[in-house]
Amino acid sequence: MLGPAVLGLSLWALLHPGTGAPLCLSQQLRMKGDYVLGGLFPLGEAEEAGLRSRTRPSSPVCTRFSSNGLLWALAMKMAVEEINNKSDLLPGLRLGYDLFDTCSEPVVAMKPSLVFLAKAGSRDIAAYCNYTQYQPRVLAVIGPHSSELAMVTGKFFSFFLMPQVSYGASMELLSARETFPSFFRTVPSDRVQLTAAAELLQEFGWNWVAALGSDDEYGRQGLSIFSALAAARGICIAHEGLVPLPRADDSRLGKVQDVLHQVNQSSVQVVLLFASVHAAHALFNYSISSRLSPKVWVASEAWLTSDLVMGLPGMAQMGTVLGFLQRGAQLHEFPQYVKTHLALAADPAFCSALGEREQGLEEDVVGQRCPQCDCITLQNVSAGLNHHQTFSVYAAVYSVAQALHNTLQCNASGCPAQDPVKPWQLLENMYNLTFHAGGLMLRFDSSGNVDMEYDLKLWVWQGSVPRLHDVGRFNGSLRTERLKIRWHTSDNQKPVSRCSRQCQEGQVRRVKGFHSCCYDCVDCEAGSYRQNPDDIACTFCGQDEWSPERSTRCFRRRSRFLAWGEPAVLLLLLLLSLALGLVLAALGLFIHHRDSPLVQASGGPLACFGLVCLGLVCLSVLLFPGQPSPARCLAQQPLSHLPLTGCLSTLFLQAAEIFVESELPLSWADRLSGCLRGPWAWLVVLLAMLVEVALCTWYLVAFPPEVVTDWHMLPTEALVHCRTRSWVSFGLAHATNATLAFLCFLGTFLVRSQPGRYNRARGLTFAMLAYFITWVSFVPLLANVQVVLRPAVQMGALLLCVLGILAAFHLPRCYLLMWQPGLNTPEFFLGGGPGDAQGRNDGDTGNQGKHE
């Protein structure tokens, strides 16, 4: 703690601030301790002219003052004093500090780095084969602030395995443990920040962007990381370039100017600028003078809070600025700490109280530490009192203190006495270290990084200077508050930065040129769908699925077959009822009048058998509707053809009898007529049916029909049907019936009817005509109709065939039986005498044939 005298002086200084006399702030950048921490801070900036004209290994002059660098140095000073005043981390020990100016230049930063590594109490770095017992002047180094400097000092300190904790260097390359084994940082790596930036672009649908980076290691590596992250998220970089540093030659300046003109003339509305402060300042300075149209600028952390960039005249017209800023704990006591020390530094009594001290050995090497720090006021530094990076400095000091606590095995009573800790011994306890700072628990991962949240910041202009407003947060995933964002557009609408419009539902991208973000939208055809919004090709549905045009999903195919409830089937069932009813009615009449001349002339029992066969044909129709099964497919053709063969064989016997009686001589007629009735007639029927059985058996064995599911016939359904494997065998199965029908037609077509007798030939002729018309029409209709309706076509053909035979042959006889019974005589049907009801059945077949 500060002593009572110092506290009194502090109170006096606050009540009676200095009157502009030189401060003694530069004298407070060094303090002795048991263990000393080195500090590298950008207290000033070197003149560009001095850097360009440097021809000797001398240091450039640092003239310009950096308020942020001084505040960060004071944050380290405050953290060390806090630790010394506590009794939990290093009880009984005091930390010291040795803070130097880097001038934001590697050339300048190397000198204090050499001082840090000099042997304690000297300015020399001796050459040894083994530095295990080497004790440098400092135990660890806090800083530097930039990746450019850390790349230089990091390798240097890593050779001696001296822990170095940066509070601002964020390059991903510094995570390489092989190259930088002793490097740590209290800020996340650039990869985290760039991941957040890529998520931001994806969140707002910006996939056509420009990416610019400063022409240094920081910018080049940042662009490389962003390119990979953008490609993985489908973000296209339309224009890419490096922004030269202020001292670059004209050729490099011309290249970035060309890139800016291309961006201005293209549809790109979003620019990622991953650059250092000076490069960003140079870029915006040129953009303002060139009147670049307003864009959305995604800023890197390096220039997002830069007063140098914010204060550019005309910067408000450059558009919307968004960027991610590391979130740390608030150091509420820090502003008061700064005010107190500035007031004390302005008090002559306090400066005198510091006492006379010897000039440090390093003063001859690096010169006065910060002469410009003795000429500032509170107003010069007030803008950066709440700078986000201040906490990173504070946390860096606490990380080293915690590692030293662990190395010394300190406890509440103190730290056990032992030999001074070497830097490499401290380093062993830095890996995967967990420590507390400002109420937060932090941890170094295996690469020496800490995991911290980012706040999404928006520049909101208030007068000539923007203020940073929180509009989101990133902690592995992005959360934005869109309503808080004020866009630069006139209607405050989110800018659109796309090469092509967003494809609609069910459309995929057909890429044009080299960029995947430039494309035409193509509709997905039926049977395919768009799986993801970024698809470049439609995904085909499975064979059991279907989809309409421009679909985003597939639907399960429903099985399609000739169902019982379909209108065509219901109509055919009505037709079946009619046909079956007529068959049963005719059969009943024939059985009732079985001994009458009309029934005997029609064949008697054979006529009844023919009607039974027609009834079975009607019933076989019921095998066609419904879901196909292997048994149904095998039974359909035989069970429909065999009964029809039985019916046609009885009609063939009628036709043969008529032909024999009408066209052959009486001797032949008498001999053959007996064979066409009685047992021989049944033998003919049996032979015909056996032939049909043989053909059907061959059809079923050689080419058995099978149940198949056709996934392509119907657009939205799976067609389940009985597939005919051979249409030739299918036709041969009809051969017996066709032959019988043809013989019937030939036997009756040219037969002359006798006056006064019933014309039996005419009915048979028209019955066969009905058969042929039905089945001849069936062939082209079956070939052209949809497969799902083919069973209905065959059902219709069978029923029409039955109805044709009934209408032409049986129904006229039923009409005579019911309404003209007077014609039911032997003379009219059989040609016998009055009362001869049996006619030819009495054995007088030959003579009756002659009377006909």
UniProtKB/Swiss-Prot annotation:
Family designation: Belongs to the G-protein coupled receptor 3 family. TAS1R subfamily.
Q: What is the lineage of its organism?
A: Eukaryota, Metazoa, Chordata, Craniata, Vertebrata
* Entry protein name: Taste receptor type 1 member 3
Cytoplasmic compartment residues: 592-603, 661-682, 751-762, 813-852
Single GO BP term: sensory perception of sweet taste
Q: Which UniProt keywords apply?
A: Cell membrane, G-protein coupled receptor, Glycoprotein, Membrane, Receptor, Signal, Transducer, Transmembrane, Transmembrane helix
Question: Organism source for this protein?
Answer: Pan troglodytes (Chimpanzee)
Membrane topology term: Multi-pass membrane protein
Which GO MF term does the entry hold, naming one? sweet taste receptor activity
PANTHER family with a match to the protein in the record: CALCIUM-SENSING RECEPTOR-RELATED, TASTE RECEPTOR TYPE 1 MEMBER 3
Its job: Putative taste receptor. TAS1R1/TAS1R3 responds to the umami taste stimulus (the taste of monosodium glutamate). TAS1R2/TAS1R3 recognizes diverse natural and synthetic sweeteners. TAS1R3 is essential for the recognition and response to the disaccharide trehalose. Sequence differences within and between species can significantly influence the selectivity and specificity of taste responses.
- Extracellular topological segments: 21-570, 625-639, 704-729, 784-791
State where it is primarily located. membrane
Q: Which GO terms describe its cellular component?
A: Golgi apparatus; plasma membrane; sweet taste receptor complex
Q: Does the keyword Glycoprotein apply?
A: yes
